[in-house]
Amino acid sequence: MSTLLYALGRWSYRHPWRVLVAWLLLLGIAGGSAALFMKGTDNAFSIPGTEAQAGIEQLSRSFPQASGTSAQMVVVAADGHKVTDESYSSAIEHTVSSIENLDGVLAVTDPFDKMVTGLVSDDGSAAIVRLQFDGQATAVSPETKTALKDFGAELQQSLPEGSQVAVGGDLFSQSLPKISIIEAVGVMIALFVLIVTFRSFRMAWFPLASAIIGVALAVSLIFVATAFASISSTTPLLAIMLGLAVGIDYALFIAARHQDQVRAGVGPEESAARATGTAGSAVVFAGVTVLIALIGLSFANIPFLTTMGIAASVAVAIAVLVAITLTPAFLGFVKGQVVGWKRRSRSSRSSSGLARPEPTNDAATEESVPARRSAPAKAKRGFADRWVTGVTRHPVVTTVAVIVGLGVLAIPAASLRLALPNAGMQPTSSEARQAYDLTSEHFGPGFNGPLIMTGTIVTSNDPLKLMKDLATEIEKIPGVKTVALATPNQTADTGIIQIVPETAPDDPATADLVRELRAQHDRLLDKYGVDLKVTGFTAVAIDISDRLGGALLPFGVFVVGLSLILLTIVFRSIWVPIKAALGYLLSVAAAFGVVAAVFDWGWLAGPLNVDKIGPVISFMPIILMGVLFGLAMDYEVFLVSRMREDFVHARARAGGADRALAVNAVRSGFTASARVVTAAAVIMFAVFAAFVPEGDASLKPIALGLAVGIVIDAFVVRMTLVPAVMALLGEKAWWMPRWLDRALPHFDIEGEAVERELALHDWPEPDTRAAVVAEDLVLAEGDIELYSAASVRVEPGDSLIVTSADPRAARALLLTVAGRVAPTGGRLRVAGHLLPERAAWVRSHVGVALLDGADDPVAELRRAVRGGAPIVVVDGADALTSTAVRDRAAAVLRDAGSPTVLVSATDPDLARALLAEARRSGTAVLDLSASALPSEVLS
């Protein structure tokens, strides 16, 4: 992958206008499509397979008047007045008759109707007008909502001064999130951090511009998707938040690597290609981990959450693609002007501001002025160097302090409560929130979240008495304040019971009441013969919260298990992945603890503009776990991969490893990567934190959790706990069983393939024209070597016969040359392309004919040469036993032009006969049975 990214980076650098115009064109198409086809977001939460959802579906079929969404108008009389006064009751009745004509309204309940009870408060200070709509909240038109609010405003004006009217209910329980100026502050902070990091205004704009283009494209595609999918209003904002954060960071990693290389003297074009191949490989790996975690949200089996995860993963995928293409393109615009201003050296100027003279090595001067000789000044150590030295010098104290500290910070997480958003979570300036609070104050909190029980009563001879008896039974259950309604439908085949709980819809006691009502199912079925289901908006919200709570453990096992597997593959270590996974769990627990302390305990609720203390949105934990997992892996990879690189190089130089060498590698690797990781973490924190003060009530706890989680994971876990634990483990940190090392695949996330290509650029000679060059090639399976020390050179148009007592060895060598099998040692270049790095190109340009066991060997050979492959490998020439078959095969090779042919056979004479008949010269023989001795060129 790194070699492909290397080529992509070079191409993007050379053609910056093409890349930029291509992305802008895609953005224009997506934006135009969104403007034409988008249908708006949908906040209707549903959860198939639950009792609440089944109840709603049953009501929609048999009792549609009760299955749709509802709203309510709360009227509160002025002090000293009652709503039963003529000035109030007449105005309310007039409003009720006006509302009945609204489009989509099925029924309006007059609180003064003699058939209705409970809609006028006990003290007469307030009344509720209930409205029932056709369909769910998303089916009600914006015009109807606006008209309903207008009726409320007109009623307010007609009532005596001091009275209050507020419109709310389920229809208005969801607020539409919006972008405020505060979010722009996060972007400006990110720009400032980029300027400081790059020490260049020009370079600072590149990550920001690429991230904005990627986010705009992702959001446009999300709105296009609303034309054929149900997408919640929180989804675009989540995509913006994630897309900005990872988009800026991914471009930062590539641009920072490029700047360091240019400062070191690498040419700008070569540097852009290398940065894309090396840092870009890590970016792709990091992006894939985030994608997997987001797609893993489908574990909860909740459609809207699955859609949210997919939409957010699209934003991350686009951020990766933009980073590896648009970033090198931006670098191509400025060429070599990326170094930035020089860091001011404190030792280069005197206190008076005059430059100090540079030290001289002139021996004569030193001898003539011996009194002025002094020891050279020590280079000033950076903060990162001093920090990691202190951490690794006291690893036990550091480890214990971090674990205990994060454990204490996680304590509030035990009290974290979850619920779907309702009007009570909206700002106090919201009319829906005012209606919610007025209802709670005058009628009790349960009136904001009534429950519905419904069932088929077609077998009853007296449906009215049956519903009355059921209401009496249910009113006895603890937690039920009153049964507001118990009635059959017009056809008397379905009954509905509306229950008002004593507690608010997001109170845990209401969830307990739902479970208790369901626990009464069998008893009521036996006694009354009615199969009752508990449903309604509140019950659906509780079911979703329960489903999400149940999904946390399997999702946690998924992401932790995934981190163990991925990091084991990347770092070839057992202890590093375990340490990383445990660190991730500490970060998540601490982030949960901070969110609970703010939203449940009320700490810093005022400064953070938290309007209501209470439960947080149900899908906050699973989204926080998924996103933080991907970001934590980012920091782990960028920090620890540099430590591993330094350790491997130091071990090779020293011929072995000990604890001191391993600790030095931890320190040097940390110091080399701390600047970029620090900048990336600060940027992510700024972007996430900007969504907290004025953010949507649903997004606010997610943004706070991510902001805190990023700070804790980057600075406390990765940059403090990780080096301490690595110092404790010493050289054992990089231990891995040999059998596991052989079994696991290799991921090149640090661009080792690019580095190898650069190192072997002139091997075997600059601009070689050889078709195949192999030097000390080895292929082993476990402890068994299929072949070893295979060295050969074949020029274009020549041939090679590979022979061995074991046909598997010859076939393995040919498949290695064809790019189908990766060698385990040695060097190999095919048609100018180094293997295994360029195996994809070789596979598409080298034909393979496996004659042994083929039904028609000639047809197999014909298929291999089809398309004009410049190199053809033919395994098992022994299958061409008859002269006639061999002649036909030779004719196929002749007709193919002049490809380079590599043939394997246990009997080399058969292969010679085939090649002679094909009129080929310059044939070499490689005998793998003789320890792959140098090839013999035959005349």
Q: Where on the chain are the PLM-derived regions?
A:
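Conserved beta-strand
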Residues: 774-777, 785-795, 826
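Short hydrophobic beta-strand immediately N-terminal to the Walker A/P-loop
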Residues: 800-803
